[in-house]
Amino acid sequence: MKSYIEPFIASKALSQNSQKAYRYDLQQFCQLVGERVNQDKLLLYQNSIANLSLSAKKRKLSTANQFLYYLYQIKYLNSYFRLTDTMKVMRTEKQQAAIINTDIFYQKTPFVWGQLISLLILELGLTPSEVAGIEVANLDLNFQMLTLKTKKGVRVLPLSQILIPFLEQQLVGKEVYLFEHRGIPFSRQWFFNHLKTFVRSIGYEGLTAQKLREQFILKEKLAGKSIIELSDILGLKSPVTLEKYYKS
C-alpha cells in the first residue's frame, strides 16, 4: 500500500509543505495498518492518534480518508473504508484508555534520549523521577535486571531483551547516573523536553509520561497481573490508585 502514496500525492494539487505533511501522515498510517485494510486495523490507527490535538487528529483523519477513497477508486481496495470519530474507543470517567501500538517507539530516531525515557516508562512503568534516579551501578545488563532504589524502598525489575540495546548505547561514558552530565543528573525540565520532542516526532504529540505509564498498567493487566502484583511492580504503598483499571 505504501507504493501508492506517491501516485496519490501526485494526483492532488498540493504545495510542497502540504506534500510533506501528506507523505508523513500516510507513511505512519501505512505502517500501522499494513497492506490489508480492515476495520480492526483502522480502529488501531484511530486509537493511536487519540491523544493528539483536535487539529492534528482532524488533519490525519482527512488525509487517511482521502487516501482510502483513492485506493478504492483505483480498485486496490474492494470495499470503501472511512475513518470517523465514532470508530475510536471513547474515554469517559468509567472507561479505560485504549492500548496503543508502540512499535514505532522502538524504531531508529535522532532523539535517542527521549526515546529511552519513553521506553523505560513503557517497559517498566517508571515515573520520570524514577527514570532520573537510575544509577549505572544498579543496571545489570548481563542478568537483565534493574535495581531501583527510591525513598519508598528497593525494587528489582526485569529488563526485556528488546530494551538492552537501547541501554547499552546510552551507558557509554556514564559515571553515576544513566541520564547525566559529568556525574550530575539532568533537571526535571530536561526530561520533560526530551520526552516531548521524541513523542512529537513519532506522531504522538500530547502523549505525556503519565499516559505512557498508563499504557504499562493496561498491558500488565491484560497480561494477567493482579492488582496487588501490579501495585508491587510499581512500588505503590497501596493499590487504591489502580482500582479504576480493574473495575469491570
Swiss-Prot record:
Subcellular locations according to the entry: Cytoplasm
Domain spans labelled Tyr recombinase: 85-248
GO CC, any one term: cytoplasm
Assigned keywords, A-Z: Cytoplasm, DNA integration, DNA recombination, DNA-binding
One Gene Ontology molecular-function label: tyrosine-based site-specific recombinase activity
GO biological process: DNA transposition
Catalytic residues (UniProt): 149, 213, 245 (o-(3'-phospho-dna)-tyrosine intermediate)
InterPro entries membership: CB, DNA_brk_join_enz, Integrase-like_cat_sf, Integrase_catalytic, Integrase_recombinase_N, Tyrosine_recombinase_XerD-like
Core-binding (CB) domain location: 1-72
Segments crossing the lipid bilayer: none
Job description of the protein: Putative tyrosine recombinase. Not involved in the cutting and rejoining of the recombining DNA molecules on dif(SL) site.
Sequence similarity: Belongs to the 'phage' integrase family. XerD-like subfamily.
Name this protein carries in UniProt: Tyrosine recombinase XerD-like
Organism the protein comes from: Streptococcus pyogenes serotype M5 (strain Manfredo)
